Amino acid sequence: MRVRNRKGAGEMLAENAHIVVENPADFKGSWSERFGNDHPIHIEVGCGKGAFITGMAALHPEINYIAIDMQLSVLSYALDKAIEADLPNVQMMLVDGAALSEYFADGEIDQVYLNFSDPWPKGRHEKRRLTYKSFLATYEKILRPEGEIHFKTDNRGLFEYSLVSLANYGMELKKVWLDLHQDEEFAPQNVMTEYEQKFSQKGQVIYRLEAKFLPKK
């Protein structure tokens, strides 16, 4: 998600260091101490303006959430929502999702969310896709054994690519939705991103999958 530079975004993040972690590498292996409890930790890589992560945190106080984005202005809007909702189980990081192993110890994370990631449609940009094998290797490293990835997109090409990429990596596809909002059972519990709200109202099909890493043989 690309947004215009927001005046004062940097100062806003700095003034809310209790939510936005200034030096996240300092907490590698000790994120439970940062949260003050030993609840499961879920991360969203590319959090956008924060509707999903704050919505999930409000619904699941028994889970700790970390919102990750590399765009300063975007993260500042997510911070707005976290402050307004006064959620003790949300932290935020202004970092590149490709470097997650610098900030989390092996097996420290319970679940990864990838929502409406940049599809990078050109073949020469394949390695930038968040479901490319190098990213999957990073997720596997920081996730607990049999940890899961939950992925949503409106881009059919990226979804098809991701299905193949995850399968080739050896992951188990637990569930696949080819039209998420038509699932009467799941739709009521689906927490949407801002992007999803906008485009689903226009009739755009939303794809979703849940996959888990399997023990190495």
Curated annotation (Swiss-Prot):
<dbReference type="InterPro" id="IPR055361">
    <property type="entry name" value="tRNA_methyltr_TrmB_bact"/>
</dbReference>
<comment type="similarity">
    <text>Belongs to the class I-like SAM-binding methyltransferase superfamily. TrmB family.</text>
</comment>
<feature type="binding site">
    <location>
        <position position="118"/>
    </location>
    <ligand>
        <name>S-adenosyl-L-methionine</name>
    </ligand>
</feature>
<dbReference type="GO" id="GO:0043527">
    <property type="term" value="C:tRNA methyltransferase complex"/>
</dbReference>
<feature type="binding site">
    <location>
        <position position="154"/>
    </location>
    <ligand>
        <name>substrate</name>
    </ligand>
</feature>
<protein>
    <recommendedName>
        <fullName>tRNA (guanine-N(7)-)-methyltransferase</fullName>
        <ecNumber>2.1.1.33</ecNumber>
    </recommendedName>
</protein>
<comment type="pathway">
    <text>tRNA modification; N(7)-methylguanine-tRNA biosynthesis.</text>
</comment>
<feature type="binding site">
    <location>
        <position position="69"/>
    </location>
    <ligand>
        <name>S-adenosyl-L-methionine</name>
    </ligand>
</feature>
<dbReference type="InterPro" id="IPR003358">
    <property type="entry name" value="tRNA_(Gua-N-7)_MeTrfase_Trmb"/>
</dbReference>
<feature type="binding site">
    <location>
        <position position="96"/>
    </location>
    <ligand>
        <name>S-adenosyl-L-methionine</name>
    </ligand>
</feature>
<comment type="function">
    <text>Catalyzes the formation of N(7)-methylguanine at position 46 (m7G46) in tRNA.</text>
</comment>
<keyword id="KW-0808">Transferase</keyword>
<dbReference type="GO" id="GO:0008176">
    <property type="term" value="F:tRNA (guanine(46)-N7)-methyltransferase activity"/>
</dbReference>
<keyword id="KW-0489">Methyltransferase</keyword>
<keyword id="KW-0819">tRNA processing</keyword>
<dbReference type="Pfam" id="PF02390">
    <property type="entry name" value="Methyltransf_4"/>
</dbReference>
<keyword id="KW-0949">S-adenosyl-L-methionine</keyword>
<feature type="region of interest" description="Interaction with RNA">
    <location>
        <begin position="124"/>
        <end position="129"/>
    </location>
</feature>
<dbReference type="InterPro" id="IPR029063">
    <property type="entry name" value="SAM-dependent_MTases_sf"/>
</dbReference>
<feature type="binding site">
    <location>
        <position position="122"/>
    </location>
    <ligand>
        <name>substrate</name>
    </ligand>
</feature>
<feature type="binding site">
    <location>
        <begin position="193"/>
        <end position="196"/>
    </location>
    <ligand>
        <name>substrate</name>
    </ligand>
</feature>
<feature type="active site">
    <location>
        <position position="118"/>
    </location>
</feature>
<feature type="binding site">
    <location>
        <position position="44"/>
    </location>
    <ligand>
        <name>S-adenosyl-L-methionine</name>
    </ligand>
</feature>
